[in-house]
Amino acid sequence: MLGAVKMEGHEDWSSYYGEPEAYSSVGNMNAGLSMNPMNTYMSMSAMSTSANMTASSMNMSYVNTGMSPSITGMSPGTGAMPGMGNGVASMASHLSPSMSPMSAQATSMNALAPYTNINSMSPIYGQSNINRSRDPKTYRRSYTHAKPPYSYISLITMAIQQSPSKMLTLSEVYQWIMDLFPFYRQNQQRWQNSIRHSLSFNDCFLKVPRSPDKPGKGSFWTLHPDSGNMFENGCYLRRQKRFKCDKKPSLREGGGKKLSEGASSVGSVGNSSSERSVGNESPHSSSSPCQEQKRSLVDMKSSHGLSPEHATSPASQAQHLLSQHHSVLSHEAQSHLKPEHHYSFNHPFSINNLMSSEQQHHHHHHHHNHQHHHKMDLKAYEQVMHYSGYGSPMAGSLAMSTVTNKSGLEPSPISSDTSYYQGGYSRPIMNSS
């Protein structure tokens, strides 16, 4: 290898590669060729060193061209190998007069047999396989830092269930997640905010205040006793069904345990649309949405806490409004059953059809005063634009008044009749055929 170092130095070739050193290098080449054919990687390296040396010193450029493509693996065909063997044999016959050309030919062809040719090329590919095998290690190392396929509810549930007391503080939940998943050791403010939201807005987590024998900071969080079947068969990748707290009616008496905090905030993530429509705009901001639903059910069944006007049935309330506001009674009765005051049409997938009657009654109870300001504007808009919804009784009165050349603002007698059929569609008589 001294020759290789000197060759990189770009010094005079003749001073380093004289006759004795050339003979010794050919002897090393023959020794390398006569080695075991299975150890072909060492023999090929010996051949490449000696061939480059002798080709440079003896100006035998054809040997170098015959050797280099097969060594570098650019053309590992069998055609380049016999040429290399012949070049080595001729080189050996020129340099070593005492060695017969046939022995050098036999030795070189023995090392470059077709079966050995495959083995001689395999160390080159094996080296690339070694380099390629290092990549999955780095990939696996980065894969451990990837985001785990668990939702925040799954992470909180796993953390609580592995604790001996089955309850953890918020900081203990954070620490458990960071210890188990390295991904959550960065961007802590972002995902910890999501953890707090998941704890607050999901009914499956209960907030337990600290007892006097456990001093410290922060309340404990535990799982709801009825939420054990959220993750079936212990698989935390997908939650089977959302847990609702209305399955346990005795939760209203649990004074210290609040199932949810901040139910009056507008952007409540994790709540369904019915819970948002009831819980977010209710005046009872300290209680949970499911408690609001239960309270609305109780208010519908027993009328304490409500005025006599709102405690009555929807039909009697519509009749009560008939005696007071005859001009807008149809729209008031319609909007009572469909409490969304921004729209007057009845879409099949609107929130009005998806909400139950108890939720609609409770929702209307809080929006009654707000609707009173909008009903005149909506009526005037419908009559001016000559366009109203399918389910609005004003459609029949407007179309009938238009067909019979009446004034658009004149109330039609048909509006008083359609107020008793709020559930059906009112269509113009002229277009019914």
Swiss-Prot record:
Name of the protein this chain belongs to: Forkhead box protein A2-B
Organism: Xenopus laevis (African clawed frog)
Function text: Acts as a transcriptional activator during early development, limiting the extent of mesoderm formation in the gastrula. Binds to DNA via the target sequence 5'-GT[AC]AACA-3', with 5'-GTAAACA-3' being the preferred binding site.
Compositional bias ranges of the Basic and acidic residues kind: 247-260, 292-302
Gene Ontology annotations of biological process type: anatomical structure morphogenesis; cell differentiation; mesoderm formation; positive regulation of DNA-templated transcription; regulation of DNA-templated transcription; regulation of transcription by RNA polymerase II
Biased composition (Low complexity): 261-282, 315-331
Subcellular location: Nucleus
DNA-binding region: 147-241
One GO CC term, this protein: nucleus
Region (Disordered): 247-337, 407-433
Stretches that traverse the bilayer: none
Coiled-coil annotated residue ranges, if any: none
Pfam families: Forkhead (PF00250), Forkhead_N (PF08430), HNF_C (PF09354)
Signal peptide, first to last residue: none
Compositionally biased region (Polar residues): 407-421
Entry keywords, A to Z: Activator, Developmental protein, DNA-binding, Nucleus, Transcription, Transcription regulation
Single annotated GO MF: DNA binding
